[in-house]
Amino acid sequence: MIAIYPGSFDPITLGHLDIIQRGSRLFDLVIVAVLRNPSKVPLFSVQERLEQIRRTTKHLPNVEADGFDGLTVNYAQQRQAQVLLRGLRAISDFEVELQMAHTNKTLSTQIETVFLATSNEYSFLSSSVVKEIARFGGSVDHLVPPHIALDIYKCYNHNYPTANPTTMEITPPHQNMATVAPQEILQEQET
């Protein structure tokens, strides 16, 4: 059975990855479908988001990424998918998603919507939250995969962290020196 996991993924978060991984255990193929939405100005282009998703999900052999325009139901039919996969963080998500599922059902009776409750640790997480934190110079390392964090820091042109190209381990951005104790500054300079 083929499932479509549609969204903007601008950027993909650990919450998205949680749904993708869990969906990959339930379905033969999960297609992470990036909507080209001309009414939004994204942080990353569709092509950049597709590359980010492919890199993030390369360990999942039954997951692929693709871009699409138009109605999700039409795209699902083109890809011969039977299921739309959606993540739910809160009751407010459920109300919106249920309405969307009912609307999609009026467009195609052949496609079902399957909801997965987001894992507790990601129940607050959205791409908008990630961008808002990064916009004001906060760390997003714990919210997105390491390579995505680097891309985000570059976009916002902050003192973004550096990554070891071999391990992709992130060295956090320098703290505001006014909040760092003198011993920490000395230790940082010694290393």
UniProtKB/Swiss-Prot annotation:
Catalyzed reactions per annotation: (R)-4'-phosphopantetheine + ATP + H(+) = 3'-dephospho-CoA + diphosphate
Pathway: Cofactor biosynthesis; coenzyme A biosynthesis; CoA from (R)-pantothenate: step 4/5
Family listed: Belongs to the bacterial CoaD family.
Biological process (GO), any one: coenzyme A biosynthetic process
Function field: Reversibly transfers an adenylyl group from ATP to 4'-phosphopantetheine, yielding dephospho-CoA (dPCoA) and pyrophosphate.
E.C. number(s) listed in UniProt: 2.7.7.3
Site entry: Transition state stabilizer: H16
GO cellular component assignments: cytoplasm
One Pfam family named in its UniProt record: CTP_transf_like
NCBIfam families per UniProt: coaD_prev_kdtB, cyt_tran_rel
Domain of life of the native organism: Bacteria
Binding site for substrate: S8, K40, T72, R86
Signal peptide: none
Binding site for ATP: S8, F9, H16, G87, L88, R89, E97, Y122, S123, F124, L125, S126, S127, S128
Compartments, as annotated in UniProt: Cytoplasm
Assembly with partners or alone: Homohexamer.
UniProt xrefs under CDD domains: PPAT
Protein name: Phosphopantetheine adenylyltransferase
Co-factor(s): Mg(2+)
Organism: Nostoc sp. (strain PCC 7120 / SAG 25.82 / UTEX 2576)
Top-rank EC class of the record's enzyme: transferase
